[in-house]
């Protein structure tokens, strides 16, 4: 098959399952087929393993499951979610994104909010470290506070644990098509950051959604 990128654009329905005859190379004489993931019955749909929703609901409904997982992932058993003067819990946010010019302004504005941001390695950790005035990304488990904002730097995680992070947070800021789908299955509010393409082609993809 020719596995293509996820999109909600109109061409996906037209192109899904079309043949792609191989005219040259080792596969000459064979036929590949275009497979387009998508959001309608005329596309390849979205991947979701059996039992995922049930596992998510069980995790989100189990008292103490989120805190126990966060203790393990952050590597600090003293980590606790904070509450405001009205006993309302803080907002827990996952940050997994590309380089984003608006990030410093968002972090600065978040200093006035009772909020903990879990910062993933890579683009996000480097950008947040720069905002903090650090020369490099801190070690996993490092915590910084600026006003009411708390920043916690995470270690790398594998896919099952990434799902648990998505399930744990009140808001997920994610990048790329695969993570957008996992954020959908998490059933939590999320913001999707597209990869910026030449000639602003990513805006057409965004408009289609």
What kind of feature is each model-predicted range?
Residues 12-22, 108-110, 129-143, 205:
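Short, aromatic/basic amphipathic alpha-helical patches
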Residues 7-104:
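A nucleotide-sugar donor-handling region in carbohydrate enzymes
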Residues 156-205:
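A donor-sugar binding/catalytic signature common to diverse glycosyltransferases
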Residues 101-105, 126, 162, 180-181:
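Short, well-ordered alpha-helical microsegments
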Residues 5-7, 122-125, 177-179:
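Short, polar loop motifs at secondary-structure junctions
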Residues 114-155:
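Catalytic donor nucleotide-activated moiety binding site of glycosyltransferases and closely related
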Residues 105-117:
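Short hydrophobic signal-anchor/transmembrane segments that target glycosyltransferases
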């Amino acid at each position: 098959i020719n596995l293509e990128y996820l999109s909600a654009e109109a061409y996906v329905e037209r192109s899904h399952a079309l043949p792609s005859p191989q005219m040259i190379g080792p596969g000459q004489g064979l036929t590949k087929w275009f497979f387009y993931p998508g959001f309608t019955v005329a596309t390849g749909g979205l991947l979701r393993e059996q039992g995922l929703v049930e596992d998510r609901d069980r995790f989100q409904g189990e008292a103490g499951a989120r805190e126990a997982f966060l203790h393990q992932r952050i590597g600090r058993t003293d980590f606790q979610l904070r509450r405001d003067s009205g006993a309302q819990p803080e907002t827990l946010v996952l940050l997994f994104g590309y380089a984003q010019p608006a990030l410093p302004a968002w972090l600065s504005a978040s200093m006035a909010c009772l909020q903990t941001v879990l910062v993933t390695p890579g683009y996000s950790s480097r950008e947040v470290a720069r905002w903090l005035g650090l020369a490099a990304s801190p070690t996993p488990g490092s915590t910084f506070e600026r006003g009411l904002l708390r920043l916690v730097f995470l270690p790398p995680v594998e896919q099952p644990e990434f799902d648990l992070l998505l399930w744990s947070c009140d808001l997920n800021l994610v990048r790329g098509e695969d993570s957008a789908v996992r954020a959908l299955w998490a059933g939590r509010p999320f913001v999707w950051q597209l990869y910026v393409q030449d000639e602003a082609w990513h805006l057409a993809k965004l408009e289609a959604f």
